[in-house]
């Protein structure tokens, strides 16, 4: 049975959260204080940059908000054009419907593998982008039918190895990947599968994930000067959306759905089950449809499919890696918010969306 072993070897990787790498000759590693300053000299240098006459509070807050938005998008004036490009670019990578049909590996085998990969992803403290890219690589390889059932786990761990090289700053050593499979696969086998993956995909790994679209939609929905939103409530809603997006990774049916549609559906469902002051659900649907350039029927179809998949994958009791992951306080413990009543509401949303979509035809 696939499982991420608990006794992970001590790696050479250093935790970056509370320690800062000391430069050569500066002595041992030193804890970083709350402001990230290691020396008094650094503190004096930063204080020297502060203006002696600070701006009025309102002006300073407005300037800070603009700077934060600009830092988030790097080129705020082009944000809409970037989003449109991402929507156009994702069409290049759409998988065929029912790409898992016709032999082995089966959708059930894939679901078990993805659940195990989520466990490995959590154990290695990898970024969410790495997980999404891992599953994207896995599905593209499965569509090409170049991997047998016997090599499915090797394909999965090698896909994560490639994805971590693409997304991570501090990536695990290849021996960590060997160890996490309990030495079922050697370094040589992982490197050989890496070559197979890159050659089969022509080194093209740059598909935008649903997480990218979710962040864009979150920025758009939260920019409402007329009616400021409840940021704390929106944090919970955003994490519920992320959870729903990862539940979609478990099911091969969602692999042929555009990532922008998955992100839109996850945000609509999350706003319905966890409303946010300052954001009206109906208005949010209109904003999302306009931003996506899609009809309401297309979004309703995506909501119906994601609601059905999320309900099924969260309710089942065997593959619980994502459910356990979102019990973390770093992810707002949104698994605890997914009560039976909330899940039933999601299920009803899926059924209602199906009815609404059929009436629009």
Curated annotation (Swiss-Prot):
Ubiquitinated by etc-1 likely during meiosis, resulting in its degradation. It is found in: Cytoplasm. Keywords: Cell cycle, Cell division, Cyclin, Cytoplasm, Mitosis, Ubl conjugation. Residues 1-13 have a biased composition (Polar residues). GO terms for molecular function: cyclin-dependent protein serine/threonine kinase regulator activity; ubiquitin protein ligase binding. It holds the Pfam family Cyclin_C. One of its GO terms (cellular component) is cyclin-dependent protein kinase holoenzyme complex. The keyword Cytoplasm applies. GO terms for biological process: cell division; G1/S transition of mitotic cell cycle; mitotic cell cycle; oocyte maturation; positive regulation of protein phosphorylation. Interacts with the CDK1 protein kinase to form a serine/threonine kinase holoenzyme complex also known as maturation promoting factor (MPF). The cyclin subunit imparts substrate specificity to the complex. Interacts with E3 ubiquitin-protein ligase etc-1. Belongs to the cyclin family. Cyclin AB subfamily. This is G2/mitotic-specific cyclin-B1. It comes from Caenorhabditis elegans.
């Amino acid at each position: 049975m696939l499982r991420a072993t608990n006794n992970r070897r001590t790696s050479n990787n250093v935790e970056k959260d509370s320690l800062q790498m000391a430069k050569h000759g500066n002595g041992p590693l030193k804890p970083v204080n709350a402001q990230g300053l290691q020396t008094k000299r650094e503190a004096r240098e930063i204080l020297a940059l502060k203006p002696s006459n600070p701006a009025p509070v309102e002006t300073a807050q407005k300037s800070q908000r603009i700077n934060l938005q600009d830092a988030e998008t790097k080129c705020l004036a082009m944000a809409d054009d970037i989003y449109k490009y991402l929507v156009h670019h994702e069409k290049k990578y759409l998988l065929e419907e029912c790409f898992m049909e016709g032999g082995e590996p089966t959708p059930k085998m894939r679901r078990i593998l993805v659940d195990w990969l989520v466990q490995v992803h959590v154990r290695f403290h990898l970024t969410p982008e790495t997980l999404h890219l891992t599953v994207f690589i896995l599905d593209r390889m499965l569509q090409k039918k170049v991997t047998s059932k016997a090599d499915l786990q090797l394909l999965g761990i090698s896909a994560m190895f490639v994805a971590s090289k693409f997304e991570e700053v501090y990536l695990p050593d290849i021996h960590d990947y060997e160890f996490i499979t309990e030495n079922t696969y050697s370094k040589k086998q992982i490197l050989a599968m890496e070559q197979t993956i890159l050659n089969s995909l022509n080194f093209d790994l740059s598909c935008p994930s649903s997480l990218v679209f979710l962040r864009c939609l979150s920025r758009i929905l939260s920019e409402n000067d007329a009616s400021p939103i409840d940021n704390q409530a929106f944090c919970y809603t955003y994490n519920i959306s992320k959870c729903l997006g990862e539940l979609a990774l478990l099911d091969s049916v969602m692999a042929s759905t555009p990532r922008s549609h998955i992100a839109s559906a996850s945000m609509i469902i999350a706003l319905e089950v966890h409303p946010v002051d300052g954001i009206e659900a109906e208005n949010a649907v209109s904003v999302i449809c306009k931003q996506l350039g899609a009809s309401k029927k297309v979004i309703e179809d995506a909501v119906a499919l994601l609601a059905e998949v999320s309900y099924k994958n969260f309710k089942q009791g065997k593959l619980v890696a994502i459910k356990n992951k979102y019990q973390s306080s770093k992810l707002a413990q949104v698994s605890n918010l997914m009560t039976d009543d909330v899940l039933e509401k999601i299920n009803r949303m899926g059924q209602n969306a199906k009815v609404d979509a059929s009436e629009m035809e």
